């Protein structure tokens, strides 16, 4: 990969207020304030190793939505060749998505079936869900703001993608990505 190529990891997730990913011990019975209203945000994100990461919200996860996410990512990383690692969700394989990618200097690299753990962005989703679970979410806007703030903070950490780069890229490309 050249310096003109940006490596990214795409995935979608729907953090919601009713998920319980937060655990705690309490001997004094600390009161827990929890919002029981179900609010969810269908979130798409691309974690960029050496470019600009994005997170956006869509109503659905259809092929048109995936194309729009790719379009937004291309705008965030103009005049770059994009390599995007993604899972085998049916909308990711749609002709509309593949045609858009082919016409805009985007290479889609699909993970093997049933291997979501190979996508480093999954760990970011786990951390975001934990944060949402521990936060009293007032409304849709508060949920989306919480997700964006967490994603922006977490996307800047190399620990999410560093091992993937070392394990799956050739050494000369890995050293370029890691700035060595």
Residue ranges and their predicted role:
Residues 10-14, 45-47, 86-88, 119-122, ...:
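Short, conserved catalytic/metal-binding motifs centered on acidic residues
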């Amino acid at each position: 990969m050249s310096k003109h190529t940006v490596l990214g990891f795409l995935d979608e997730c729907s953090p919601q207020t009713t998920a319980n990913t937060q655990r705690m011990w309490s001997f004094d019975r600390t009161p827990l304030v929890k919002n029981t209203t179900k609010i969810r945000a269908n979130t798409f994100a691309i974690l960029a190793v050496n470019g600009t990461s994005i997170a956006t919200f869509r109503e659905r996860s259809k092929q048109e939505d995936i194309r729009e996410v790719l379009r937004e990512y291309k705008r965030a990383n103009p005049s770059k060749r994009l390599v995007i690692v993604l899972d085998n969700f049916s909308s990711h394989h749609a002709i509309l998505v593949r045609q858009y990618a082919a016409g805009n200097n985007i290479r889609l690299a699909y993970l093997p079936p049933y291997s979501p753990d190979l996508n480093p962005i999954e760990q970011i989703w786990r951390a975001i869900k934990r944060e949402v679970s521990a936060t009293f979410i007032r409304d849709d806007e508060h949920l989306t703001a919480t997700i964006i703030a967490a994603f922006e903070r977490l996307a800047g950490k190399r620990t999410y993608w560093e091992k993937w780069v070392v394990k799956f890229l050739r050494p000369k490309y890995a050293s370029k990505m890691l700035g060595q």
